[in-house]
Amino acid sequence: MNYKQSSPEVLRQLIRDGELVGHTSGMAEGYIQANVVILPSKYAYDFLKFCFRNPKTCPLLDVSEVGAHSFPYYGPYADIRTDVPKYRIYEHGQLIKEVDDITDLYTEDMVSFLIGCSFTFEHALLEAGLPVRHIEEGHNVPMYRTNIPAESSGYFKGNITVSMRPMTMTQAIKATEITSHFKNVHGTPIHIGTPEELGITDIDKPDYGEAVTIKPNEMPVFWGCGVTPQSVALDAKPELMITHSPGHMFITDIKDSELND
């Protein structure tokens, strides 16, 4: 099956049925993919403020009604409890397990957040002839925790996370131009080259995802990453926090051209 050309609705059904379990990079070309954070309602306002204060890493797309399973605009026929290939369950800041269905954990008190994902702009990079190495190599995108603090909000504080795509400087400049039109899905890079300035000591050992080849004439190009809330959860320690597993996104019904400004 050609996942690249498949519709979001078809892919979500495959995920719901347990037939699609891997990362979603390169799927549903032209449609927005989203990071997912699900919290008890008492944490929702603080997290909403956290997103607004950190738009490069947590560009907020939508927030559900309390207890709702879907999103009227981004996925009216979706079910947030089943339509992500893999979820992470955090309790009091500790990663407890990964599951492929959260129906038994989701209560009428939960609020779901959709946060923009850089997978959304990857097809634009490819169309411009720019490399997206993790797609070339069939990997999940490499992601790294940094030493850069996020702007805190109530319970939520900690350092930001970044994703990385290797490019030449000429390609990085072109990628910056292209991604400047995708402000709702992380926008332009936050750093180019010198990973040690971000506190990254070994570029070949990402904290999430998989390492990719960096050629001799290339440098790492870093974008803000929606995995940031998972890092922040280690400090916030909410009694329960459910997220997507890194790289395993929620595929929305909205085309990226609707956000491309």
UniProtKB/Swiss-Prot annotation:
Keywords: Lyase
Pfam family, one: D-Glu_cyclase
EC number assigned by the record: 4.2.1.-
Top EC class, one word: lyase
Cross-referenced InterPro entries: D-Glu_cyclase, Putative_hydro-lyase, UPF0317
Record bears the keyword Transport: no
Gene Ontology MF: a single term: lyase activity
Top-rank lineage group of the source organism: Bacteria
PANTHER family: D-GLUTAMATE CYCLASE, MITOCHONDRIAL (PTHR32022:SF10)
Family: Belongs to the D-glutamate cyclase family.
Protein name: Putative hydro-lyase SH0274
Organism: Staphylococcus haemolyticus (strain JCSC1435)
